[in-house]
From Swiss-Prot:
Domain comment quoted from the record: The RING-type zinc finger domain mediates binding to an E2 ubiquitin-conjugating enzyme.
Protein's UniProt name: E3 ubiquitin-protein ligase ATL15
Classification via PROSITE patterns: ZF_RING_2
Membrane topology: Single-pass membrane protein
Gene transcribed to yield this protein: ATL15
Any GO MF annotation of the entry: zinc ion binding
Entry's localization field: Membrane
Top-level taxon of origin: Eukaryota
Entries under Pfam families matching the protein: zf-RING_2
Zinc finger region(s), RING-type: 118-160
Native source species: Arabidopsis thaliana (Mouse-ear cress)
Lineage: Eukaryota, Viridiplantae, Streptophyta, Embryophyta, Tracheophyta
Amino acid sequence: MVVMSRVSFYSSFLLLLLEVVVASSEFDDEGRTSFSPTTAIIMIVLVSVFFALGCISVYMRRCLQHALGMDSGGGPGNWLNVRQTTEPGLDASVIETFPTFPYSTVKTLRIGKEALECPVCLNEFEDDETLRLIPQCCHVFHPGCIDAWLRSQTTCPLCRANLVPVPGESVSSEIPGLARETGQNSLRTPIDDNRKRVLTSPDERLIDSVAWTGNQSMPRKSMSTGWKLAELYSPASSPGQPEENLDRYTLRLPQEIHDQLVNSSLGKQGSKGQLALPQERSSVRGFRTGSLGTEKNYFYFERFDQDGRLDRRPFSITPPYHTRSIQSPDEIINASGNYQDRAGAPKGLLLAIRSPFDRLFTGKKNAGERSYLQSGDASPV
């Protein structure tokens, strides 16, 4: 279709030139036209030039179709769909293998104190926001920001790491920069070397376009991401500078936590199971409080007895203040209502915790005191 339109254009232009030549030709005494040798030569040259241009156009189009692997019999739509078929992104099933989790579950476990940001929308992550982790490079994004990129590209938008899974090859669980944090700079792995080569690559293309439909409700710090991403790949920066700048976009976790995130995501493959990460524990016997959820208006306290067993009871933070007991497998309740373990040791002492307002208005002298209630009477231990 394109070739025929070009041939018709050349033919029309040639006929126009022929009319000009005929109009400029000489007439003899009998009224007949006579062509001079110069006019004949001009006509032959013009016909030859246009014929050569047509042949070259057809040849170049055939070569282009062969280079792109297109079939000439596929219809006119093939010429328009060349750009769409040359840039495929990641499959949806591959994108789902990248773990997603709330930021609050890893905020206290991450290595480093620098604020963590999304490189696309340039917003700091909040506790209730969901993160998507790229296992190959440990960069984190909002799912609405990175999913649009991954559907059209196969690399990380920051470090250009290849995210296409290789059959038979497991996903790398090496955390970049972990050796530097722990002081083991002498231990170098091929994964770290490959990542450094990617970071110092001359390919400095930035994110061209991102669909913002998933994060339109979040305020943006800038209408464009080019200026902030450009400083990561500035030619004047040293080889170690890009990696330093990427720290605020990199989630560094302990190795076992990182492996648990990646393996749980690969295992569920579309299931909506909740990920349970280990909590920090203290080896010192004593008391510890924690939240049971703001919607329940409870927080729990934990007590370690002399035998090292854990005693956990929730405490209401709304009047009337009371405690509820959570019976462990090692505890039973006798007929009088007192707690006993299976060995017969009494656990009748219930901890009474003052409200935060009482702690605020009491002096420092009583700040560290704890009281115990037994059958409604307070007696210190």
